[in-house]
Amino acid sequence: MNTSRSIVEVGVAMVLKDRFSQEAGKISGSFRTMMNDMNTWNRGIQMSASNTMDFGMQLVGGMARAYKYSAGVQNEVWTASKIAGATIAEQREMLQLAKDVNEITPLTASDVASGQRYLAMAGNKFDAIKEMIGPASKLASIFTMPVGQKGGVADLMTNIMSMYQIPMTEAARVTDDLYTAVTNANISLTDLAQSISYAGADMATAGVDLRQTAAAIGVLGDMGIQGSMAGTSLANMIRYLQLSLVNQKKKGYNALADLGLSPDEFFDAQGNLIDLYTIYQKFAKAAVDLPSRIETPTFFNIFGVRGNRGMLPVLRDIASGRDKMGKILATYDQNIGAVNRLNEERLKTDAGVIDQFESSIENLTVT
């Protein structure tokens, strides 16, 4: 209060002196400058205090978010380890694995940990999870999909491998095969997995492997027959074919004879069905120049309505010379190691370098 009064008194004195001095204008200007400087200084103190408070709140908030994120990652790993029956040492290794995978992919440690949980939920133990999470995460990064959560790559991949009883040690090869099938046809990984969920049981029972099944799904996908529709078509096709071959479907058995096909040529020496691509080729050859008046009832009697959708589109594709199934089958071996190679190439790009930097910062919060 005294300070404010002394300032006012000085101001009044200056104004009074202005009336009797030739320097009156300068003095009034000096006073205004002094007051402006003092106001600026006062606002600066207030802003500094406010900024300090804001910074402190942001710092505390950031620490809270980091702690919450770290706790979330550790909880995912803890849950996965309990489901998988892992030891304490294996649980720690799973946490470190989530951080390691985070550093070589654009995925978050939280997403990777979620992927581990879904692998565990599918019945995989620690060793299998360790084999699968890296390849699954790399495939997820290529397809810009999550590796965790329901419908993520880990979930889809373990379902497919379980359907065909593929050892988890072959996870890297499976990701290469899935990458090849998806990138050579008009389907997504989700489409492919859904088709396999409908067709896989019948295909696997008939001895048709993942590569051939995925290649056939790719051909149908190019023609708009995708997802469950493709899977249902292929399941009916292979099922009715086998029934026709052993004369349990009498009209189908007779239709095979009308095409000049013998049931014996569809089985190997051990009595197992020959490979799917060769089956398609045999029917494609038999159907050449066959008039629709004969083709329609003949193939209906063998494969039924839905089964025809899994046979005729592929035959037309082969007859056209496009032969997408043959091309996909030939590409599988060429693409061995493709997922790992593409992931390494991406890490060398500007986006990859940024991702690695962000991952390193993220890993600091996961302790």
Q: Which residues make up each language-model segment?
A:
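Amphipathic/coiled-coil alpha-helical interface segments used
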Residues: 17-20, 34-53, 102, 161, ...
